[in-house]
């Protein structure tokens, strides 16, 4: 089940985002330590969508979608270990469908740092296509790396 998360869901969203197998993959050198991270301000912003994924009442993952403009949203994917695989692909497509049905969104994009092969593979499995490279745009472990830009449109 996909649902829009609110401030009342902050504990679960924080738990997913700061999970030891998730946070290192979604954070860069400018982010706070996982224990200091608080998603509450993002959940309080009506322009940002946080879509939670639950299986039989158990939180499995979530997507944070931030607007670039009226119709384009950048997705940040956070799937807990044990829930990755075919079900996560279905859930990602459901989350994207939710955005297309319930918001002005007509395009979802994501940025994947060079070297994050699992994230790149997942994005392509859910139908995203490579659209370009943003050179030297991500700082991780003291190294500056490129990011791959991928996207999918409502019509696709």
What are the roles of these predicted feature ranges?
Residues 1-18:
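A short beta-loop-alpha structural element at the N-terminal edge
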Residues 21-39:
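Conserved GNAT-fold acetyl-CoA-binding loop/helix
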Residues 47-61:
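Conserved beta-hairpin
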Residues 63-71:
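A conserved beta-strand-loop-helix scaffold within acyl/acetyltransferase catalytic domains
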Residues 70-82, 111:
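Conserved acetyl-CoA binding element of GNAT-fold acetyltransferases
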Residues 85-99, 121:
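Conserved acetyl-CoA-binding loop-helix of GNAT-fold acetyltransferases
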Residues 109-124, 137-138:
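Conserved beta-strand-loop-alpha-helix junction that forms the acyl-donor binding cleft
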Residues 111, 129-145:
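Conserved catalytic-core motifs of GNAT/GCN5-like acyltransferases
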């Amino acid at each position: 089940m996909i649902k829009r998360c609110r401030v009342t869901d902050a504990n679960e969203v924080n738990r997913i985002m700061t999970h030891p197998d998730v946070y290192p993959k979604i954070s860069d050198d400018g982010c706070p330590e996982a224990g200091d991270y608080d998603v509450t301000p993002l959940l309080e912003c009506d322009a940002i969508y946080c879509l939670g994924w639950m299986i039989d009442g158990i939180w499995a993952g979530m997507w944070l979608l931030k607007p670039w403009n009226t119709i384009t949203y950048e997705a940040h994917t956070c799937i807990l270990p044990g829930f990755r695989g075919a079900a996560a692909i279905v859930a990602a497509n459901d989350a994207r469908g939710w955005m297309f049905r319930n918001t002005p969104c007509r395009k979802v994009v994501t940025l994947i740092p060079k070297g994050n092969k699992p994230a790149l593979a997942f994005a392509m499995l859910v139908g995203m296509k490579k659209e370009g490279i943003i050179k030297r745009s991500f700082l991780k472990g003291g190294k500056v790396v490129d990011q791959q830009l991928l996207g999918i449109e409502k019509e696709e």
